[in-house]
A protein has these predicted regions:
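A conserved mid-domain beta-alpha-beta active-site/ligand-binding segment of alpha/beta enzyme cores
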Residues: 96, 163-210
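A structural signal for short, hydrophobic/glycine-enriched beta-strand patches
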Residues: 1-166
Length: 210
């Protein structure tokens, strides 16, 4: 099981949803991709951080295929520039040549952070995706670059009762209905070995903040 108790899961969820921030300006904002129905959440979350001068740059992933076999080539750079983020502060990363998903995004982001020797980064995803995105990120950090300090910031709120397409454009429902499958994915990917446990993420947060 991903979490050993409801209390452990509740603690982790609350800390991810209301995380501390780094003491210094972050090296980057890692932006996890979303469908068009939900992408305003991540764009506005990233814009808010950047406008507050809390990070040097924004990183997003592209490349590979969706499960529908469509190329994953989001037009995020254009949209970030339209939001006022300068092009020189935007880094598009090739995340994979195979299947593009949250885990391959995390692998690419942390490999790039390690190459650049970044010290602090923010992770931004839509609220119902944030838990899985952050746990994926920390899982890769612990295995490949444990010196990196990763901080969680939610994308902006979107109405929970609105219908939206999610997860590679193949899942739809009201946004609150998408949470159940997010949890199922966390359990499945933990059982597969892709994700560390809730306890390991909490231990990472405690060590990060010492």
């Amino acid at each position: 099981m991903f979490a050993s108790s409801y209390v452990e899961l509740l603690e982790l969820t609350q800390r991810i949803m209301d995380d501390d921030g780094p003491k210094a300006k972050a090296d980057a904002i890692i932006m996890y991709g979303q469908t068009k129905d939900n992408e305003d959440s991540i764009f506005l979350g990233v814009k808010r951080l950047y406008e507050k001068n809390l990070a040097e740059r924004v990183v997003f992933g592209q490349g590979g295929k969706l499960v529908t076999r469509q190329d994953y080539l989001p037009d995020y750079q254009t949209k970030l520039i339209q939001l006022g983020i300068p092009s020189e502060a935007i880094i598009p990363l090739q995340i994979t040549e195979a299947l593009a998903h949250t885990h391959t995004e995390a692998l690419a982001h942390i490999a790039h952070a390690k190459m650049r020797q970044w010290k602090n980064v923010y992770v931004v995803a839509s609220p119902f995706h944030q838990l899985r995105a952050f746990v994926n990120t920390v899982s890769i950090v612990l295995r490949q670059y444990p010196e990196l300090k990763v901080f969680s910031v939610l994308g902006t709120h979107l109405p929970w009762m609105d219908k939206a397409i999610h997860s590679q454009n193949v899942e739809s429902g009201k946004r609150f209905e998408l949470i159940q499958n997010e949890w199922k994915r966390i359990e499945a990917y933990h059982a597969k070995g892709d994700l560390v446990s809730a306890r390991q993420v909490l231990d990472y947060l405690n060590q990060r903040d010492q």
